[in-house]
Amino acid sequence: MFELNNFDALQIGLASPEKIREWSRGEVKKPETINYRTLKPERDGLFCERIFGPMKDWECHCGKYKRIRYKGIVCDRCGVEVTKAKVRRERMGHIELAAPVSHIWYFKGIPSRMGLILDMSPRALEKVLYFASYVVLDPKETPLLKKQLLNEKEYRESIDKYGDDSFVAAMGAEAVKTLLDEIDLEQSSIELKEELKTSTGQKKIRIIRRLEVVESFRKSGNRPDWMVIDVIPVIPPDLRPMVQLDGGRFATSDLNDLYRRVINRNNRLKKLLDLGAPDIIVRNEKRMLQEAVDALIDNGRRGRPVTGPGNRPLKSLSDMLKGKQGRFRQNLLGKRVDYSGRSVIVVGPELKMYQCGLPKEMALELFKPFVMKKLVQNGLAHNIKSAKRMVERVQPQVWDVLEEVISDHPVLLNRAPTLHRLGIQAFQPVLVEGRAIKLHPLVCTAYNADFDGDQMAVHVPLSVEAQAEARFLMLAAHNILKPSDGKPVSVPTQDMVLGSYYLTMDKDGVKGEGKVFSCPEEVLMAYQCKAVDIHAKIKVRLKKVIDGETIERIIETTPGKIIFNESIPQDLGYIDRTVPENKLKLEVDFLVSKKTLGGIINRCYMKHGATKTSIMLDKIKAKGYHYSTIGAITISTSDMVVPEAKRELLQNTEKQVEKIQKMYRRGFISEEERYEKVIDLWTKTTEDVANALMGSLDSFNPIYMMADSGARGSKSQIKQLAGMRGLMANPSGKIIELPIKASFREGLDVLEYFISTHGARKGNADTALKTADSGYLTRRLVDVSQDVIVRQEDCGTEEGYEVSEIKEGNEVIEPLVERLSGRYPSEDIIHPTTGEVIVKRNTYMNEDIAKKVSDAGIKKVKIRSVFTCKSKHGVCARCYGMNMATSQKIHIGEAVGIVAAQSIGEPGTQLTMRTFHTGGVAGADITQGLPRVEELFEARKPKGLAIVSEVSGTVKMEETKKKRTIIVVTDDGEEVSYDIPFGSRIKVKNGDIISAGDEITEGSINPHDILRIKGVDGVKNYLLSEVQKVYRLQGVDINDKHLEVVIRQMTRKIKIEDSGDTELLPGTMIDVFDFEEANREILEKGGEPAVGRIALLGITKAALATDSFLSAASFQETTRVLTDAAIKGKIDPLLGLKENVIIGKLIPAGTGMTRYRSIQINTDDENIEEDSMDSIEV
């Protein structure tokens, strides 16, 4: 039985005229739409009820048959079938054309498919199709050539010269159709393959492109002459509706106008042909028909687009699919859903971490069907209808039922933009008064939400499965770690940090200092009776039973620390409990700041799991808010103390600057040096003022406390408040040498204020641009990696990928421990001195083991990596390693591709947009920040290219007046010389030994050069460390494996150089695994294998080169992708996420995987009874 949504693959192809007639329910003969008086569709028109079905349910056009009892009857008067009006969304019609026309996609696309298969230039083809030239179809005995073009004059002359029937020439799509009909694909294929063996250069490229099209037609069973259309399908009328506006006017879809033009011209052409009109008139009419059909299929592709009122181009069928507003992205990938609402958010500090406050009226509307069902169940309403009435009238008993319904029904909260998967989380709703959603303060970081008017959307998971997944996988209390680097995301911020910081401070000489208390409870009592200050250094006797023996100790602490430690588990490993005197010490015996809080949460999560951590977080939150209120930490101008030393420092610097100016005026130093020196001086002074300021601030100064605890603000901001603002940059990024000497406390003068606004304005403009760029980068990353899912446990590869720490200059950017933890080594790791095996191959390394390896002094380790994974689709769990979001091993079915794309894209907005200008005129600008990441992922030739050595050897430098040359001498004495342009900085010294692919000058390397010199492993390594450098320098941690996933997708295709005995075509791109498989088969038969080179594709190209045409078409260049796919008769295997979302199937990841869907649960009654008996005995 054929089920509509139960299929494994989807094929696309060209539609033959027979197929189009088969789809159709009748021919549309008239351009009329709806009768303006009766408002009923005209017969045989574009909205005809006989063809497309009735406008009203169960009612024919003339009204003879009304009601459902006549279902399926075709009215004998008007010929309309009595059925649902919904069929007008699926029934198609057709238009029989009086003359064939070409399909513009196949004629005009790049490369022109029609041109390639006919071996005619698109220009020549255009002349024929649009009736400007004749093409010779059959030269017979004449010296004319087949497919030769003749203009009107030449045609006349040829006829005069050779006689009327001596040759056949024609124009228009009919001529092209005849030519296409004559093509013998098998023969063409053989001939082209023969030609390919001997040809070179441009000719070879052309033959390869022709061969590709010929092979596509040959293998797919599409016929070339189907690229010329005899019949045009008319899409169902409800997909191109016509609606009446209030003024009696009609609003209609543009498609109706385009169809009308086609029908009008077609009917006129029929009439002219019947009348036997002169050739020139008929020809003109055919050309107009061709243009009308072009406009219908793809308006604006050729010539000027057809415009509607107000000079707006009409939206053609292609435009309906293309772009953000097209069918793919607007309706198939982003649908609006029912059971959803949105409202403003307010903070809910009293909530538990898994709760959110839902406004009553919103909850009632969202859970309406559930409430109605419950009302009937509880006997408060007799039937669903009366229950609905009760809900709509909001009768008092409804509220109790609503409470009951939502008690264990999670809801999903989402804040746009959803940059990573923590942008949607599940919560247990709590009904609140008012109309605002209440959000727990600790999930704000994940959502990037604040309460200045942000709005959030609520969605209700309906099915039991959806509710279970929401509760177990998406509950906010479970999402404590960031998927990008495995660090906690639910870290207390602002007031909570400030309260905890205040609580754990100590102060000398306050009330109660030095007192000794008998137990913690007594301390709290004394604090509540105001007998002891919260920061007083006191001693407390603690008692605890450990392993059956009671231990007593007196410890030194403060009341605040005792209060704070109540909410912290006392086994997080901050204190070495093996030492007897430490047995009862408080776990957190230090000043708590935002950073240390993150550490506490991380340790708690690793030790006790999510549930306990979320309970601890709630306690910290409550205490933090309470004590930041009690501490009454406020901010005032008197807290901003301008340091005494400032005036003196400024005067000294001004004197030195004057000295430098003098030297410049006397010509001792150049303009460049003067500028550099002045900048250096002022930078140092700003630092000195800042240090003087920090030294003069009291540790209980509120502003200092806020910055030091990490609650709000930073040292640099304090510096601006009370020190000096320092140097500013102008909009182009150059530093202005006049510093701002004032601080905000003293106030800026006019010039200083003006200079300040420069930078601020630039910052705002940058941010706006950056958001869009970052969003687009994320979209491309998602598209390139969306089908990477963990599909198997172990791919069984023996290969490994060698990792060492990543350095920039002398600074370690990513240490070895970070690159090793959560991975499997691909070979035994042996201690360099003792020779013992630290880790066996294929054993999981957690952070402790990774530390052990690093401490043993090992510098390079081979690990299992996504790069070397042999899974054909997706990756295997061993090569991927640890799931960063849970710090457990990854499960099969995890959509690691999407997670990777989100982890790289989400911090995109934090990266800078700047291009750094190096001093000096010819110095290359090094791109950094977001543009650099984009440049790497798109595998573009970078700005500021470095010169790279092609060979390994020793460096020899030669410098003449005209140029500098570096010569690399290889081991066998061969010399390769490189000319160095002036202004670029040389990285190597005389006598250095360098290897192939090393930089000679500073700058960025073209990744394609690295691929050529160092091979595919070299380029993978380069891309990985370069992207990491950009992110790490901005203080963003991303785990390597996310980058590996994307880079692997960029290096998956092989460009075929020689096809050997395989079916593969030279010059085409093919997946690495398909390539290996094809070669394996040929070798088994004893043939010659194909030869190919790995190609490095940018993410846009890689996303378009995917096997799935649905995914590619919904990404970019929709028409090109579909044209190509149709000719090849491509089959989409529906392996990725996007394709399945588009056709409305469950995604093949997580619980949507077949292995989870096909689990059978046995429920034999006997077994259940026995089981229950057993459990009772226990």
Curated annotation (Swiss-Prot):
Chain sites annotated for binding Mg(2+) = D450, D452, D454
* The enzyme's E.C. designation: 2.7.7.6
Reaction catalysed by this chain?
RNA(n) + a ribonucleoside 5'-triphosphate = RNA(n+1) + diphosphate
**Source taxon at top rank:** Bacteria
Positions that bind Zn(2+) 1:
C60, C62, C75, C78
Which SUPFAM superfamilies does the record match to this protein?
beta and beta-prime subunits of DNA dependent RNA-polymerase
Which residues does the annotation say bind Zn(2+) 2?
C795, C869, C876, C879
Which residues does UniProt assign to the signal peptide?
Answer: none
Record keyword Zinc present: yes
> What InterPro entries does the entry give?
DNA-dir_RpoC_beta_prime (IPR045867), DNA-dir_RpoC_beta_prime_bact (IPR012754), RNA_pol_asu (IPR000722), RNA_pol_N (IPR006592), RNA_pol_Rpb1_1 (IPR007080), RNA_pol_Rpb1_3 (IPR007066), RNA_pol_Rpb1_3_sf (IPR042102), RNA_pol_Rpb1_4 (IPR007083)
**Any one Gene Ontology BP term:** DNA-templated transcription
List, alphabetically, the Pfam families matched: RNA_pol_Rpb1_1, RNA_pol_Rpb1_2, RNA_pol_Rpb1_3, RNA_pol_Rpb1_4, RNA_pol_Rpb1_5
Query: What GO molecular function annotations does the UniProt record carry, in alphabetical order?
Result: DNA binding; DNA-directed RNA polymerase activity; magnesium ion binding; zinc ion binding
- Functional note: DNA-dependent RNA polymerase catalyzes the transcription of DNA into RNA using the four ribonucleoside triphosphates as substrates.
**Family classification:** Belongs to the RNA polymerase beta' chain family.
Report the protein name in the record. Answer: DNA-directed RNA polymerase subunit beta'
Q: Which organism is it from?
A: Clostridium botulinum (strain Okra / Type B1)
The gene is rpoC
